[in-house]
Amino acid sequence: METIDIQNRSFVVRWVKCGRGDVINYQIKPLKKSIEVGIYKKLKSSVDDHASAVHIAPDTKTLLDYTTKSLLHKGSSSNIEEHHRRSSQHSHSSSNGSDNKRKERSYSSLSISGIQQQSQEIPLREKLSASGFTLVKRVGNVSGNTMVQGDLEVKDTDYYYAFILDNSSSKNAKKKILFNASVINGDNQSMISTRSTPPARPTALSRTSTQQDMLFRVGQGRYLQGYLLKKRRKRLQGFKKRFFTLDFRYGTLSYYLNDHNQTCRGEIVISLSSVSANKKDKIIIIDSGMEVWVLKATTKENWQSWVDALQTCFDDQFEDKDTSTLEENPDILDDDKEVINKSSPQDHDHLTPTATTKSALSHRQHTQKDMDDIYVPLPSESYATFSMNLRLIQQRLEQCKKDSLSYKPTTLHQRSEGLNGTHSSSSVFTNNRVSSFNHSSSGMTSSDSLASEEVPSNKTYIEHALYNQLADLEVFVSRFVTQGEVLFKDHQILCKKAKDTRVSLTSYLSENDEFFDAEEEISRGVIILPDTEDDINNIVEETPLLGKSDQNEFTKEVQLSGSEQIASSSVESYTTNDENHSRKHLKNRHKNRRRGHPHHQKTKSAQSSTETFTSKDLFALSYPKSVTRRNDIPEAAASPPSLLSFLRKNVGKDLSSIAMPVTSNEPISILQLISETFEYAPLLTKATQRPDPITFVSAFAISFLSIYRDKTRTLRKPFNPLLAETFELIREDMGFRLISEKVSHRPPVFAFFAEHLDWECSYTVTPSQKFWGKSIELNNEGILRLKFKTTGELFEWTQPTTILKNLIAGERYMEPVNEFEVHSSKGDKSHILFDKAGMFSGRSEGFKVSIIPPPSSNRKKETLAGKWTQSLANETTHETIWEVGDLVSNPKKKYGFTKFTANLNEITEIEKGNLPPTDSRLRPDIRAYEEGNVDKAEEWKLKLEQLQRERRNKGQDVEPKYFEKVSKNEWKYITGPKSYWERRKKHDWSDISQLW
């Protein structure tokens, strides 16, 4: 059994190659401490979703751009897009002219540490789902010093199997595992170990530093071994020398602490990964979708050797997908794949240094280039033949199915007689079929084929009528597969040339877009990314598939699509100083959303009728009588704890694993806190009736900050909702209804949807905090999207950053910092700038709003000013746009709540008996805490948190019910009969899980 080291908060993937009918025999034994184990499978064809070559970048910046774009498309990090949005906002604000436009098209790449950090922050379950893993068997938690073994029958040939050894839940403890997995061949019952004994390695004490920089080929050419510098997991740790082994037979790259340590620390299947490299800095980045390795060679010769070897893994996968050939001929790598120089006549197990291998793949690269140069698109008749053959296959299969129902086996005597007369000819026929099929087996495996079975020599084989039909069908299928390969290659070349015209546009993708994976841009060869806009334009001009007029039209469509994508994915597109560019993006997005998407291809009358129906169907807002609300809340039963004393009591402990006392909370959840955004919703209704709506929308965007005007509010934090916890808010007096739900636990993500007769607003938010010693920076990462139903005008903005100051000592308070913008699809925008506070001046409350009309408008620029704790007014007309509402009586003793906030946890007559069991108002800990029963609230809080942990550990976590994920950072409200308000109308909570 091999030994595997698993770092804390990490995991290890062990891959197994097998075929249909095989049995995987495995043994797992954790040493001392337990480990979580699951068996997954992943489609072999998913290699087409990755780059099929090592991507060579001309410099490190381009390399990081490419890797960042690859992460964006794969979903390797849910925070990357937001990082890009913020980075792009900064770059837009500091550039103008042509430089500004060029930056708008390009990626703002992450640093090497940022790429690793973002990848590590994603929960393992999300990584598995995003990378295409399917759970086969959950082994569960294996206790320390306990041997678990079992067998798993393989029922398909289209998958790699993977053992996931999960230590991500352990915050500090590293684990050591004894592991073995062997494949028992289904045909001859022979056992094939998935890992041979590690090949002999040089003795570390006898080697100089120069020798350590050399590469070695061992195990009869099966392995390439040598040292590389590997970027460590944590920030600022730099690179560390590690010993790497590339197994050509399985296409896996593993690494160890050094050359005399047999404990594996990680493994990646190259053909299922994206590999990018930069020769100038000798960097290689491997992204498997599960983890990111950043490697660095010590010399350019070593870098080239590793790149060529990694490229060979891709070529083996693409050129010969029948893995059985490789399994039966392990020495094929020495004969056919010149990964490194030929070995000397000495024993193959002797270690021989390698040289550079530029010529190893040059033939393939030149061949591919020549094919691209002479490429002629297939005629339309080929595609017609392809469709016709599909129908013929369907008909023949149907006929064989009918014949098999009436088929009766013949006697042994009849079989023998029949064989004597037919064996000779059938052998030739079958052998021809084998040759034909093996030549075109890209989409099928030998175990699936009748032709893959050898012709028996004992003459007990007979070709009856049904068999002959199936044999003929197989020959036909083999031709079909061959034709499919040609068409597929034709399609790839077309896609590649079309994709090159939109290199800089496919980075921002909205939920309504159909797109190719980013990796298809480097399809089947090594390509240097164009660095400039001119290079991209040259590619468009050189494309032979489009005429001049078609080319212009195509470019316009791509640009239009790109504008929609940029606008819908983040507010980044609107934070540029180029007002025309910003306005064009929003207009195009608005235009496309109304006419371009398939779901919106309706007539004008149909759209209006739908809107009318939606407006009249705002259930629960037409309550027959006025609802009386309490506008107050009981006084707090306990004072908030001192954070300084809490830290003193927990010196040296991991604060993330320590539960804060319930007295550190206020009696509302985060869902209810964010719902306070709509306290001043009448501003939106007023905006729909005014010629200058952006003025009132800007006031609404700022009004949320006013909940912190009483400094008592900053002494406590809201309760953290459980996964799938909900909160509804019906304000019939203001004419809107709201539903919110916690849709993700790690990272915490909350989705909101509010609607009124005149407007609707959606918001997906991920709260984040940064601790700065005596203060905390708070960010609500997400875009508020507002739409006016009558005019179709769209508004977007992000909530401003706030700072919680004097965290340890002094009077604690909250204040907004920096600036933010509100953008309209009609070209208007507002710029909100908060006053900066002096070192000894206390809280800063002043701010200014600049209303900037589009250049084509005759309206003049307006300025608004005010205090976010009081009001906002127009400096020219002195019209009061907004002013704060009332606080509860004696707010110092009542958590600093406003009257609006005090009503959030009340169950009024409009909610009584109608709420789902997941609503925050029904949480027993919040209810007990509001009523002053602190001990009971503490008990319930711990109990609910423990129940949620148990559900998660058992793999039985609840799923969101009312929102669906449409992109990495956006969840969309579900409409139709399964929508929240339809369920509430019918009181249909039948499939809702009990959270408490």
Curated annotation (Swiss-Prot):
Its main location: cytoplasm. Residues 558-577 have a biased composition (Polar residues). Residues 642-982 are annotated as: OSBP-related domain (ORD). It comes from the Eukaryota. It holds the Pfam family PH_8. The modification Phosphoserine is found at S190, S193, S324, S605. PROSITE patterns: OSBP, PH_DOMAIN. Keywords: Cytoplasm, Endoplasmic reticulum, Lipid transport, Lipid-binding, Membrane, Phosphoprotein, Transport. InterPro entries: GOLD_dom_sf, OSBP_sf, Oxysterol-bd, Oxysterol-bd_CS, PH-like_dom_sf, PH_8, PH_domain. SUPFAM superfamilies: Oxysterol-binding protein-like, PH domain-like, Supernatant protein factor (SPF), C-terminal domain. GO terms for biological process: endocytosis; ER to Golgi ceramide transport; exocytosis; invasive growth in response to glucose limitation; karyogamy involved in conjugation with cellular fusion; maintenance of cell polarity; piecemeal microautophagy of the nucleus; pseudohyphal growth. GO terms for cellular component: cortical endoplasmic reticulum; cytoplasm; cytosol; endoplasmic reticulum membrane; perinuclear endoplasmic reticulum; plasma membrane. The keyword Cell wall biogenesis/degradation does not apply. Residues 1-183 are annotated as: GOLD domain. Residues 75-114, 338-372, 556-611 are annotated as: Disordered. A 1,2-diacyl-sn-glycero-3-phospho-(1D-myo-inositol 4-phosphate) binds at S657, I658, A659, M660, K717, H745, R746, E945, Q946, L947, Q948, R949. Gene3D superfamilies: 2.40.160.120, Pleckstrin-homology domain (PH domain)/Phosphotyrosine-binding domain (PTB). It is found in: Cytoplasm; Endoplasmic reticulum membrane. Residues 582-603 have a biased composition (Basic residues). One of its GO terms (molecular function) is sterol transfer activity. The keyword Membrane applies. Present with 589 molecules/cell in log phase SD medium. Lipid transport protein (LTP) involved in non-vesicular transfer of lipids between membranes. Functions in phosphoinositide-coupled directional transport of various lipids by carrying the lipid molecule in a hydrophobic pocket and transferring it between membranes through the cytosol. Involved in maintenance of intracellular sterol distribution and homeostasis. May serve as a sensor of PI4P levels at PM-ER membrane contact site, regulating PI4P phosphatase SAC1 activity. May be involved in ergosterol transport from the plasma membrane (PM) to the ER, however it does not bind sterols directly. Belongs to the OSBP family. Interacts with SCS2. This is Oxysterol-binding protein homolog 3. It comes from Saccharomyces cerevisiae (strain ATCC 204508 / S288c) (Baker's yeast).
